[in-house]
Structures are given as structure tokens and as C-alpha cells.
Regions:
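Catalytic cores of carbohydrate-active enzymes
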Residues: 3-142
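Non-catalytic C-terminal accessory modules of carbohydrate-active enzymes
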Residues: 32-33, 99-230
């Protein structure tokens, strides 16, 4: 319930901004009042990392407190569906921990032959399994056929699923720090969160061409060079 309320508060606040832009003062006030009411309802993340992330994003929980919930036991309990939002909130206070969780979570899939994002994944599934491109050897489990959870058990589990691709926007928006701040991508701000990375290279498509970005970590400070379309 707390996670759903947090999402509703975020939606109402965005609704207030849109209403203000459209000069609808009445609807703007309704959205603001409803969002304020939600702020007064006590909430509990109940140890759920995704719930803590949404409560943090909605201003219903301090970012530092949410970070402690998300960091607990590393990549355990991370949702493929909500990976971006969870890591984004963690990176606001602890870039290195966010990167470490991403590495462990996504690397497990890559080491098992993934070329696309899986519908669901738990790092514990990798134990005693081989690549998805090979038939299991004697004594091995099949990470596709023998693993899964909820309604994703066995071969019903998709190995090419868009909702699990949150690693991509996280790397682009948070790690490389590429933020669109002008309508139509006319203006871009670059504010990387490198953590303990030594360098970053990224290519970002825009309506005017591809932005090429290179960032070096110089004693904790990013040195940014780029090639932007005309």
C-alpha cells in the first residue's frame, strides 16, 4: 500500500505541474491538495526495496533511510521490473553501492549468455547452471527451464523483455548523467555519477544526431569531452 500511495503522490504532483502549464488553476489545486493528504498518511516499506525507493522518490522517506533498505544484502530482492527506479534512488546517496548492485545483478545474466534483458532474474538462479546458448550438462540445472518465480516459472519466463531494461536508462541518465532539460532535446545537461568507475563512454541519440560522450575520472572529478550534433 505504501508503494502505491507513493506512486499516486508522484502522479498527482506531476498532474499539478501539467495543470499549471495548461493554466488550469482549479485542477492544479485539486492535485496539490490530494498529494498533501497522502503525505500525512503513515507508511511502511516493510523491508521491500522497491517500496522504499518509491517512498523516497515521493518525499515520504528520507533518501538516506531508503538507501539503507536498498543496500541490505546487495542485489537480493531487486526487481527486474523496477530496477531503474530502485538504483536511481540509491545512487542519489551512494553511487558505488548502486553500481555494485547493477554489476552483480546484470552480470549474472551476461555470464549466462544473455543478449537481451530477462523478464525476471534472481542472482541465486545462476548457481549450478550454464549458458542459455548450451544444453545443460549432466548434473547441471537449466537456468531457463528450472528457474523462475511467480507466473514466470520454467520456459514461460521470457528472455527478451522490455520492462527489465532499466539498466539502460540508469546507465545513461544516472551514471553518464545525460539529462534532457530542453523541449525536443534542444538542451542537454551532463552530470555524471561515476562512483568508482575510471571512465565512461556513451552514445546518445537525439533528433539532431548522435551525442558522443567520453568521461574520465580525475581524482574524483569528472573530465567531460563530447561531440554534439549541429
Amino acid at each position: 500500500k505504501s508503494g502505491v500511495r507513493a506512486l499516486l503522490k508522484i502522479a498527482l504532483e506531476k498532474g499539478a505541474l501539467i495543470s499549471k502549464f495548461l493554466n488550469d488553476a482549479q485542477l492544479c489545486e485539486i492535485c496539490r491538495n490530494k498529494a498533501e493528504k497522502i503525505s500525512k498518511i503513515p507508511g511502511d516499506h516493510e523491508g521491500q526495496k522497491q517500496t522504499a525507493a518509491f517512498m523516497s522518490a515521493a518525499g515520504l522517506m528520507k533518501k538516506e533511510q531508503a538507501a539503507e533498505v536498498i543496500k541490505k544484502n546487495g542485489s537480493d530482492g531487486i526487481s527486474s521490473y523496477l530496477l531503474f527506479y530502485t538504483l536511481k534512488e540509491l545512487a542519489d546517496t551512494d553511487e558505488i553501492s548502486a553500481l555494485n548492485i547493477l554489476k552483480k545483478y546484470s552480470l549474472g545474466m551476461l555470464q549466462r549468455g544473455a543478449t537481451t534483458f530477462w523478464e525476471d532474474y534472481d542472482p541465486l538462479w545462476a548457481k549450478n547452471t550454464g549458458s542459455i546458448t548450451d544444453l545443460p550438462k549432466d548434473g547441471q540445472d537449466d537456468i531457463h527451464g528450472d528457474r523462475g518465480d511467480y507466473c514466470y516459472k520454467g520456459f514461460r519466463h521470457s528472455l527478451c523483455h522490455g520492462w527489465a531494461s532499466g539498466a539502460v536508462p540508469f546507465l545513461m541518465e544516472q551514471v553518464a548523467g545525460i539529462h534532457i532539460i530542453g523541449a525536443g532535446c534542444r538542451k542537454i545537461e551532463i552530470k555524471p555519477k561515476m562512483g568508482n568507475l575510471k571512465f565512461i563512454k556513451a552514445s546518445y541519440p537525439t533528433p539532431y544526431g548522435v551525442l558522443e560522450l567520453s568521461i574520465e575520472n580525475k581524482n574524483g572529478r569528472p573530465k567531460i569531452s563530447f561531440s554534439a550534433p549541429d
